[in-house]
Amino acid sequence: YKNLDSELIVECPEGHRVYSTWKKLRVKKECPVCKQNILKEITTKIIPKKKDTYRVLALDQATYISGFSIYDDKKLIRYGTFETALSEEIERDDAIRKWLISMVTNWKPDLVAIEDIQMQQLGGKQVYGGDNVVGIQTFKTLAHLQGILMETCFEMDISFILCPTPTWRAHCQVKGRSRADRKKSAQILVKEWFDISVSEDEADAIGIGKYASETHTVRKIQWQ
């Protein structure tokens, strides 16, 4: 550029072209397109649920990092992750249970969509690690967590569904032969739908929420 007032063309992290001067950019690096996307301004502020709104809380649960998304009448309004680094499985399960109670209490969903668990396929081969077939221990760990989440929803009188992975992926048109390819495909789709770049856990949770909000309707809860 020739001087501080020369127009520059730069690209933001989301791939949008920004036309501005270095005088402005060096003070505040801001993309006008991203600024208008409310999903880019994710905060901890709880959005009150409007009357007659159907709200879905979707979970891509795991014992260390769980993705979540919240939809109001098929519209994504919030997404993120919950992380815990506690050493014992039961401690992590308890932390996620308490987090779910907090999310339900604060966000007041009509439905909680939980990703169903599945045994990981190993290409027809049994691969042993110690005295366990690889995949079985992870399956058991996720089964424990799934049961805890289901029981928590039951105790709080919240409707819930289990979303089989192949089902929600087919609904969202997630492609790919390998697990890594399907994870990447979900991230690309989220970028296409909402113009946001998200983690694998967030992408899956957003896909689960999209599937649940577009295919399931249950009674609306009259929260006090």
Regions found by a protein language model. Name each.
Residues 1-45:
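Functional cation/ligand-contacting sites centered on basic and imidazole/sulfhydryl donors
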Residues 43-224:
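Phosphate- and other anionic-substrate recognition elements at nucleic-acid/protein interfaces
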